[in-house]
């Protein structure tokens, strides 16, 4: 659509990567830590964002505190927009996870 919209976001909700849902009504972010581009002190979360007026209302979906952000989670929506799929290394090995939204 080539329409640009800016939204206000709290500092700790910054993510390294964002993606939009297939219907373009929601966004997801993969969080980050103080050493990543996001530079968030308490941002180790998979977030769901819903645009409301000029801000993004966030919902924390997955606590990523045991994830090493050298592996980027790279969140994606499932084609039916019911799940967010991401990768993580919670237990030392890389795995693919899904969280229902």
Residue positions per predicted region:
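Loop/turn-rich, solvent-exposed surfaces of beta-rich toroidal or solenoidal domains
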Residues: 8-55
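Conserved hydrophobic/aromatic "anchor" residues
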Residues: 1-2, 20, 29, 77, ...
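Conserved blade-ending motifs and adjacent loop-strand segments that build the rim/top face
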Residues: 8-19, 55-77
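A short, hydrophobic secondary-structure junction motif
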Residues: 47-60, 77-86
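Structural motif
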Residues: 1, 36-48, 92-100
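Active-site proximal loops enriched in glycine and acidic residues that flank catalytic Cys/His/Asp
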Residues: 30-32, 50, 62-65, 88, ...
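Blade-level signature of beta-propeller repeat domains, shared across WD40, Kelch, NHL, RCC1
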Residues: 72-101
């Amino acid at each position: 659509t080539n329409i640009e919209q800016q939204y206000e976001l709290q500092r700790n909700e910054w993510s390294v990567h964002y993606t939009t849902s297939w219907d373009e009504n929601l966004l997801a972010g993969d969080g980050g830590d103080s050493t990543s581009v996001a530079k968030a002190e308490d941002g180790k979360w998979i977030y769901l964002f819903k645009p409301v007026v000029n801000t993004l209302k966030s919902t924390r979906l997955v606590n990523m505190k045991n994830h090493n952000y050298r592996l980027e989670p790279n969140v994606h929506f499932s084609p039916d927009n019911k799940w967010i799929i991401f990768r993580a290394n919670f237990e030392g090995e890389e795995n693919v996870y899904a969280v229902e939204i």
